[in-house]
């Protein structure tokens, strides 16, 4: 009766332990979610509830329109306040995931009588989904390496600076929800791989659909998963679970992706998606081979194998030929400009300068890796090693995700955001394995220390004898069933016989060797735990600093510290408020495309170009106007019905991201469409200068005049704090533009086009002067015989 009671007590204890572990795990995940949300609120605490950057202002404006007019009007919205006189169809050119998500949250809160404004919901959408991303990271890592690694990875992702940079409160951009969708799609794919459940496969397709709605980076998913499927096939890991995980994703995911207006038929017509279809065909060929192998004898299987391979190769070659024909018909070979710039990092700088001009599309520097992922860079190799011990479908997918993300992040700094989850997952796995080994070593050493104590020496002989008898009996009992189990399995083939022998011989010996290898000395284990805790402390301090100082400042409100304290530069909102209150509603404002979204959203004025950059010719026209002399620029702007021109200037306060520093991109983009604009005309010996050594073309262009007009009056010298020298042309007047507003710190300057002169009056003057000249020279002039 004692043995059943002890077994039931042990079972009850294990159930209680599992229940307590589940509650503790849920509570830890809740704390991780709170951490992920709260660490992103520094921007609201330090400044106010304000939208950040440039693109979020367009998303905020679209969300306002959706909440006010409904989803039907949203899909059919033609915006006449952007890209004048062309306009823009919003419903068919925007990824609607972020807008629909925030609009749904706003509708639910107002349905529950929680009257929050649309702006407040937009500001806090990114912190909310950062918590969701942390929980999705836990689920993905748990499928790969267990609960401990999942909790560690979730905690690391909640604080990683690379993700914080795009998910602070106010950063209302597509990546705010897309990173969660990316991680959750990967989790459902791995979950389907591990379970073979068609339910999870369907959820995976729906999650992929949400990712397509949210961000153009969905092409990373539809290319990474086929690569992993192909890797599993090549390494002999094909199974029915792999088929269930991939086939529904391609079919359902492609059909759902085609429903998104901004994607449409691109889901089946562009080169970014062709790899998924090719792997889909290969997967079916492999599945057919495995199916036939189970039905036929070995001799018939060889004949059928050759037939299937022949037909499969013929089909693959036919599909490849069709794809090549489709790709060859496109000038960009079926790839988008951004995709080509990822495959060939020099493509954008050679052919599409508008893409290369965006700072997010530049390659990162080495310090940016240590800034954005910090100590995780040193933990990733250990995580890779842990994934190979042992290697599973889930762990191989995580390693493949890391390798591809590292490459793409090295091409484009914006894709550091895609690298962050992979780095956190592998770092979490490495830390979990390290803590597991170190704590087990400490536990073993402590138990050994207590077992060797004098108090327990009296019972040691009896316990050792009983333990030895039990161990010998258990060893015998363990070896016997192994022999009986391996005996019938030795029949099929020699390879299986060798494998089963190796497994049978290694099973009873392996645990003893592992225990000896994993046990470390007490001092080394305690020191290792302390070092890992200190390393984690440094990581937390760095993440909090990055969240509070580096990534919380909105670009529309700038701050600077000096001996006098903190100085706030609110020039952008000051300029947009002036435009809103002192200009007509239908007035057109011209500026470089960086400020188009903000001008439309905050000043409610029509702009010529904005951050969508869908029409390179229109942007080149504005760049040409800025690069031209004053009169030629006035004619270009006047042809576009422009009434005001806005420029950003940082020479007085030292703001480096001004239009003078961006000017060469205007020249390059304008020169790509209008050949008379040549970059060497603006350079002196290959150097870009605006001082006395600047070229006449540079010192007489419109951008120079609008930025430096009356600048010499500030200090009497015209010293530019950004460039670090005095300007070349200090005293000049404007003939076709007049200054109407300059902000407090001279960061934003607004000019108005002067009206056209009275042409009738000018003609009369010319006629009078012409008649006098003709009368005086008539005597000495001979008559033209051809008149």
From Swiss-Prot:
Residues 1-18, 145-146, 196-197, 235-239, 294-306, 389-394, 438-525 are cytoplasmic. Residues 453-507, 759-787 are annotated as: Disordered. This is Dolichyl-diphosphooligosaccharide--protein glycosyltransferase subunit STT3A. The record marks 55, 360, 662 as: Interacts with target acceptor peptide in protein substrate. The chain crosses the membrane at residues 19-39, 126-144, 147-164, 176-195, 198-212, 218-234, 240-265, 274-293, 307-327, 366-388, 395-411, 416-437, 526-546. The keyword Metal-binding applies. Residues 40-125, 165-175, 213-217, 266-273, 328-365, 412-415, 547-787 are lumenal. The keyword Nucleotidyltransferase does not apply.
